[in-house]
Amino acid sequence: MASSDRSSAPRPVPGSYGLPVIGAVRDRLDFYYFQGQDKYFDSRVERYGSTVVRINVPPGPFMARDPRVVALLDAKSFPVLFDVTKVKQLLFSLLQSRKDAVVPTFRSNFSALFSTVESQLAAKEGGNKVEFNKLNDATSFDFIGEAYFGVRPSTTDLGSDGPSKAAKWLLWQLHPLVTLGLPMIIEEPLLHTFHLPSFLVSGDYKALYSYFSTAASQSRVLDTAQSLGLSREEACHNLLFATTFNSYGGLKVLFPGLLAGVANAGQKLHSRLANEIRAAVAEAGGKVTLAAVEKMELVKSVVWESLRLDPPVKFQYGHAKTDMQIESHDGVLFQVNKGEMLFGYQPCATKDARVFGPTAREFVGDRFLGEKGKKLLKYVYWSNGRETENPSVDNKQCPGKNFVVLVGRLFLVELFLRYDTFTAEVGTELLGAKVVFTGVTKATSGPGTA
Ligand code: HEM
């Protein structure tokens, strides 16, 4: 965006999507039959007096994803399509600027979670069982809001409804991929054939948007976005997506998966973790510092092992950019043509026994320790890239990669500063593991007892 344009305040993109379904079907008929392609776009540019307009693009219902787009119909705006880096730059700058807030906000939010676990375990009516996932949803949502913007969503107008609104919106994004356990005859038409109507979730989206708009303004993130050439409105939608879908959606699955793996690994691993964590924290003067966390090699290995065995995002898609050959692990070459859609199911790739040996399907906490262990890291793919590589504005690797491995480690630190060991029942739910605490043994040594 040229600096001369910035002097005028950004305005909303004009246009209309019409009524759900009916609007898109009408537009499709215009596009294919009544107007033809060129006229379809030209007439809308004329109608709204703007070359950047909100319109539906065919095919729309019921075949394609959401038909609603912001269409860029002039030579100046169009090149934005070539450049996804502004949004990424914004996320890198956000994570970098909030680096120092992560440890204290993590600790305050998650120590409150564990206090709740303890009091609920002590209360007889709970039957000595405490569901971790529900507590994690509420805590992770608040933690992310506070870590990124300094404002806990539960203290705003959203109140305690943030996680449920976010989960509903997530379901609207992910329903083609999930099953709710209902009979197939109901689920197929409901979840897998059509997109759920967006007006049913628009109230939830608006409430979330309002939180992001206020919190990101207060924390000046939207000022940064503007200085990168993004409009405040566009930046806010992107922050909502990165925070709710990528970050909250990620932590909703990451922590139960990690806890499940560690619970099943048993007491021996628990005491090794507790010893390592407490020694490093004691050495740092009783404080959980980033430097202390860096020294915890076993902790890091356990987080990687969990991400290897149970990657939170299991499917990957990509178009072949050129005609290419793909080699399988059996040494077979396959021809793939430009434009073909490639699809990967990650759990298969990261449990390959030819890389991870006979224990490939097992949780081995210390797998990545030492020189030999480090050599395996390049086969850990959870971030849409190798664990030995780093995300940048030029690649499609998860920009939250380092943040995720850090919070995974902080989770174990909090757990084993507090407890010598714990027991839990492990099952599965919609998107990953379900964990129910059945008992915790308070720490008998180290800084956690202070
Ligand atoms: C456990 C947590 C997380 C997991 C498992 C995860 C995983 C992934 C994966 C697999 C992708 C690639 C998707 C694809 O193109 O196929 C991705 C992309 C992305 N992630 Fe994460 N992520 C997590 C947390 C985060 C966090 C905390 C952020 C916050 C900044 C984030 C931001 C993004 C963004 C913006 C992309 C799109 C990158 C691009 O297409 O260029 N993620 N993530």
Please provide the spans of the model-predicted regions.
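Hydrophobic, well-ordered secondary-structure elements that form the walls
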Residues: 306, 339, 363, 400, ...
